[in-house]
């Protein structure tokens, strides 16, 4: 089901966070866009243009049936799931099978974001460089592993979605044990922490590489650096992202080409091979250059 309105299109964005506001702001400037529906949107998305309309503030990004009703009511031409939870729940597949044009990854491909354990195993299968790791579903086994390691510094991650907050950079074994306890005993992130990944602690320059792809052809956006820590000066715990500097001048062409050949291309090929469908419309990868343990 798709409608066109005098050569202009109507877009529905699923989600209500900062990224939705940024996308809405950009779409509202296009003469090709007639109406933007934010489901549910937020205070920022509701301001700045007569093209933008928030829908029911109580609707959830995972309520696909309810969102379908919104899309049909407003006769939208394009659906853009922005919320991680909506993507993981299969919003792209859901709307595509009902005749809508959708920008985003299928549910199969979204596993690379929804499960860090699966993502790490995927990288191993396709020989994509990644930090060494172990995954655990038992806090006692995770603790025994930490105590057996010769190094003190580790990265402890919730395997599931935790709104960008499920990564702890631990400088001591005590900090790592505390992270395990938060995830698996206190369950501060609920089901997201039922399984965890413990990685080696790598140090280097971090960059964010973003592409648009249909699974065969891809285009690279300018490379940036994501500010993930909550406080100024790169301090405090990780968040879903406080901002990003684009373009970044800290990386050279040779480094970008290496990332393209060793990470981007194998990832796209691997996702296509394993999903057996057009795997992605959008892919963002964080890489570490000149890394060391």
Locations of regions flagged by a protein language model:
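Short beta-strand segments
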Residues: 14-15, 81-82, 156-159, 199, ...
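Electropositive phosphate-/nucleotide-binding environments in soluble metabolic enzymes
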Residues: 17, 21, 61-65, 73, ...
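Conserved anion/nucleotide-ligand pocket segment
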Residues: 153-173
